[in-house]
Amino acid sequence: MKSSFVTRRFSWCRNIYYASAAAADSGREVCTFTGSMTQVKFSVFCDAEDDHSSNQIM
C-alpha cells in the first residue's frame, strides 16, 4: 500500500523528491523536485524500483 503523498530521499542525490503516487501508472511515479538553493520546481519521472534510472524532466 502506497500513501497518497510520500516523501523520499534518493541516495544518489542530496535533493529531496516529493513523490506523489497519484500518477503511478506503469510503475513510474511523478515526483516534484524542489531545489534548496534555487527555488525551481519541475516534475520528473522517478522509478520506484530503481533510483538510478534515467529521470526525464518534463
UniProtKB/Swiss-Prot annotation:
Keywords: Plasmid. This is Uncharacterized protein y4xF. It comes from Sinorhizobium fredii (strain NBRC 101917 / NGR234).
